[in-house]
A protein has these predicted regions:
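Terminal accessory/targeting
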Residues: 1-4, 14-57, 66-96, 100-116, ...
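DG-centered beta-turn motif at the end of beta-strands
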Residues: 7-10
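Active-site histidine-anchored catalytic micro-motif
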Residues: 126
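Surface-exposed loop and adjacent secondary-structure segments within mature catalytic domains
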Residues: 61
């Protein structure tokens, strides 16, 4: 097995970002993705450059925070993205408004990186690909940029490089060392390239105001424990650059 340990939500908060950086530097996270519209996106890019983090993707976001483009089709009356299913089921979405926002998020990361950070894959926040318009935009831009993409239901039929398997069970009640141990035992002798989804990070007071998922520190410590116990010694750890 070749394993990408992917950390979602880089830039969502300072503490989450710091936790992901520590995980990458510690060798128990191999890749991450940035939420370009969030207040700590620039901080995340700075930390990626400072720590020479090479595998950074866009975590395309239409459901949390404010858009980078001024388009009321994407937002509520306060200029904030419609949340989760409300956005996915938004009857007012157009190809143009989604395309422009995704490109704006990519350009935001490029601007923050000042030529020192290049995106190497695409993921989406929440289940954006359940919307046909969003799915088409994600396909078109990912194809245009010749980047690999996360393997999820909506992208399974894309003629774009992606992992063979997407493992998302390491979450909530399954955030424990046995979950990781069983996962590695099941797949270690295969030739599959697998992405392990994670949402690691440190938790501070600000983070508690912007996310309901607070097991991030537990995920981080469990991944660290797996590294210390040698669970990853049985497999090959890679990042998204291997899928180019």
């Amino acid at each position: 097995m070749k394993l990408i340990i992917e950390a979602d939500d880089f830039g969502l908060s300072k503490s989450i970002t710091d936790g992901i950086v520590d995980g990458i530097n510690g060798g128990y996270i191999t890749s991450t993705n940035i939420m370009a519209n969030m207040p700590f996106a620039e901080y995340a890019v700075e930390k990626a450059v400072e720590n020479n983090i090479k595998s950074v993707g866009l975590h395309f976001n239409l459901t949390v925070g404010k858009p980078l483009t001024k388009n009321p089709l994407l937002t509520d009356k306060n200029g904030v993205f419609l949340y989760n299913r409300k956005q996915i089921e938004n009857p007012n979405l157009t190809y143009e408004c989604v395309y422009n926002e995704m490109m704006a998020q990519i350009k935001q990361i490029e601007k923050f990186g000042k030529g020192k950070l290049k995106l190497n894959h695409i993921t989406c926040h929440h289940h954006l690909g359940d919307n046909a318009i969003i799915k088409q935009v994600v396909y078109d831009i990912t194809k245009l940029l010749n980047l690999p993409i996360r393997r999820v239901d909506y992208s399974a039929d894309f003629d774009i490089n992606k992992p063979d398997l997407y493992y998302k069970n390491f979450s909530m009640k399954n955030v424990n060392i046995d979950c990781l141990r069983n996962f590695i035992e099941e797949y270690s002798n295969t030739d599959l390239t697998i992405e392990l989804l994670s949402h690691p990070g440190y938790i501070d007071d600000y983070t508690k105001t912007i996310t309901s998922y607070l097991d991030r520190d537990k995920e981080l410590s469990t991944l660290k424990q797996a590294k210390e116990e040698g669970l990853f010694d049985k497999i090959q750890l890679i990042d998204y650059s291997a899928l180019k």
